[in-house]
């Protein structure tokens, strides 16, 4: 409840021994509505552990967990022109730093299709992640490529993403961790 509606927070998932097993971003969508992202490969494990904790550690909580992994696609637009590109795609969304600071989200729409736009970054660059129903992802992808043409937009893959995040000191669980590291070992004691 400390996370304000419309805000996002990066977090680590720890085993009972305090070792890091996953990470992700939790966003507060409404008074009692959150969405949590995880690593792609860790989603099922995180959901299982949260369900276990709800039954064994927090049975008094009135919380329901639902996986929506296959319902949404995410298109990340990064770099120095990301704001201009997103503005062309969603012209009525105020992207000013005052209205849309880092680690926040806004509900919006692209050509009448509802979406969530998050100002978060795994690359360390100025970025927006557009969450859209999966059946619209191809169309929104094509729109983003068209909107970015004048800025020489270029798709990037996981190898580029890994290099960019490494330059910023961001971890990849399972690659930079092996189940034997705590947040302190990773020099991330600021998160504890």
Which residues are covered by each model-predicted region?
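Short secondary-structure transition/capping motifs
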Residues: 2, 15, 35-39
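Glycine-rich, Trp-frequent "lid" loop and neighboring beta-strands that shape
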Residues: 25
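Conserved, structured C-terminal
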Residues: 29-192
